[in-house]
């Protein structure tokens, strides 16, 4: 994912961004001794595992290497995310459904998405649902639930750090298989909010806290 985007930015816009390995090489040359890495992933998926493996290759190049956790790591993270999202969207202010688009993955960490939905609903926000682009639940699963509840309107928003291609095309795009059009074909009016999680101050604070709590890799 990230390497493909780095390549595209360089070819299309002439913008050069280091890969993780390139950034680490730069820090080694600069003589850095202590390294703290804070990824901006939502879950502990394949890319997080890959990052750990890359960092392990550099353990002998630094005196210490510490790694922060993704957004959703421990139980308090789920509570903080739900509280923050409710402050942004005010779930009880409307009878409309709120549907969040997660990335999804074939990694077992995909379980974070249904777990998040379960905890949101357990807090009484029974009009809030989580779907994913590449995992479970899919938009068809969410649509089925909304139809069972005779829902007529839904607000769609990304559960991703950046509102990029998935949010603009897979969620809000004009293609017939966009989430917006899938819902509207089912008689559910869909209103899309194109803002990534990274634009919210409370999410930025969560990542800053995770960086402060970064654990040493051995």
Regions found by a protein language model. Give the residues of each.
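Active-site-proximal alpha-helix that buttresses catalytic centers in soluble enzyme cores
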Residues: 1-218
